Amino acid sequence: MQIYILGNGAMASAMAIGLKDKFEVIVVGRSEKKLENLANLGFKTEIYGSSYDISNKNIILAFKPYALGDMAKILRGKARICISVLAMSNLEKLSVINSEKTCVCMPNIAAKFKSSVTPYFSECNGKFDDEIYEILSTFGKAVRVENEKDMACAGVLSGCVPAFLAIVAESLANGGVKCGLKKEISANLVSGVFESSAKLLENMHPSLLKESVCSPAGTTIEGVFELEKHGIRSAFASAVVKSFEKSVK
């Protein structure tokens, strides 16, 4: 199956790399210079210029959201599948792109490593549903939300939380350095714990995981009490809410 990615930014590149092992990926951009890095990685590239035919193609919209109107004037024909990663662009806004099936999704840059968590929503006509899931699950875990209004919050959890967790990882590694570890060793331990904890959380409720690690009067519960004292729970919950509120403005 051929997939045409319209855009050449960080997300377009991440998806192209994540998809290349299973699909034939063609990256479409404004100029050869902007596509040079992807071309050097072996991807086929095309220029859309003042007009570009999307007839019967499977396309992924990965350009800047503000460019949607201008791109709609350039694109000709009717796409087969149109998958959009454009922030704050719902199905109604995307109707300016002619396609048989439209899907909105919010992957994150971990798509490059096939580790993205991608919430998505598509028109409920059943058409091409399996193919859309196959495409999105190629670069990680694809999660279909029940209705389109849930995409804003789901997008925050998948797209913004990596930044929140990066702060956590950096803080934990700094704590290790404060206690005497070399920076590289501390960072490696933290990244490893993130990976192993993620696997545990797939089959275990967070509270049960925490309780399984905390021994009475032990070292872990001492640290947990310190986190609770500083309002760690409300800080993270508030961060999600603030990002959500910003996304729907």
Report the location of each language-model feature.
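Residue-level detector of alpha-helix initiation sites
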Residues: 10, 66-68, 227
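Internal alpha-helical scaffold of NAD(P)-dependent oxidoreductase catalytic cores
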Residues: 93-101, 117-153, 163-203, 242-247
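NAD(P)-dependent Rossmann-like dehydrogenase/reductase catalytic/cofactor-binding core
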Residues: 188-249
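NAD(P)+-binding Rossmann beta1-loop-alpha1 motif at the extreme N-terminus of oxidoreductases
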Residues: 1-50, 54, 58, 115-116, ...
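Glycine/small-residue-rich loop that forms an oxyanion/phosphate-binding "nest" at active or ligand-binding sites
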Residues: 51-53, 58-124
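A short glycine-threonine-serine/GTX helix/turn-capping micro-motif
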Residues: 154-163, 210
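Residues at the starts of beta-strands that form the adenosine-phosphate
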Residues: 2, 24-25, 81, 101, ...
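Short, well-ordered alpha-helices that flank and scaffold nucleotide-derived cofactor binding pockets
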Residues: 13, 17-21, 40, 73, ...
